[in-house]
Amino acid sequence: MPDLYAIIRIRGRLDVPPDVDYTLKLLRLHKKFHMVIYPSNQPGLKGMLQKAKDWITWGEINYETLVELLRKRGRTLGNKPLTDEFVDKYLSKYGIYGGIQGLAKALLEGKIKLHKLEVIKPVFRLHPPRGGFKRSTKRPFNDGGELGYRGKSINELIKRML
C-alpha cells in the first residue's frame, strides 16, 4: 500500500525558472496555495518533487486530514462541492461506496488515483495558513523553513489551510 503524498505550492510565479515552471504545470500546481494528491510510487514523481523542491512542500497525508480535505475543498466538474451523494452516485462504477470516507479509504489503499477520476477536480484550492507560516518560505523544512519534504507534519499545515 503506497503512501499518498499531499503536494502544496508555497511560492508564487515570480522568478521561476522555465524548467521548474514546466514541472509545476505537470503537477497541476499553477497557483500559490494549490494542492494535489499523488501516490508516492507514481512513476517520475520523485524527480519532479526534487526539481520543484524550492517552490513546494510535500508529505504523507493521513486518513482524517484527507476526509476533512475532501469534505471542505473537494470539487466536482462544474465547481460544485463534493458530497456523499455525488460519490455514491458517480463513483459506484469504480467500486467506491460509503461516501467521502469510502473515497478516502480507496485513495489511501491505492485502489484508485484521484488524478485519474474525471468527475472530481484533482486540484484543491486552499487558503493561506491560519496564523501565517511559522518559518521562512525561502528555506527548506529541515533547515528551519517551510519548503521541501516534511513527512507527517504536512497534516498540521493542511488543517491550518482548510
From Swiss-Prot:
Among the GO biological process terms of this entry, one is:
translation
Cited Pfam families? Ribosomal_L30 (PF00327)
Mind giving the lineage of the organism this protein is from?
Archaea, Thermoproteota, Thermoprotei, Desulfurococcales, Desulfurococcaceae
The record ties this protein, via HAMAP family, to:
Ribosomal_uL30_A
What quaternary arrangement does the UniProt entry report? Answer: Part of the 50S ribosomal subunit.
Q: Which family does it belong to?
A: Belongs to the universal ribosomal protein uL30 family.
What is the protein named?
Large ribosomal subunit protein uL30
Which key words tag this protein in UniProt?
A: Ribonucleoprotein, Ribosomal protein
Do the record's keywords include Ribosomal protein? yes
Its cellular-component GO annotations read: cytosolic large ribosomal subunit
List the source organism.
Answer: Staphylothermus marinus (strain ATCC 43588 / DSM 3639 / JCM 9404 / F1)
Molecular-function GO terms, alphabetical: RNA binding; structural constituent of ribosome
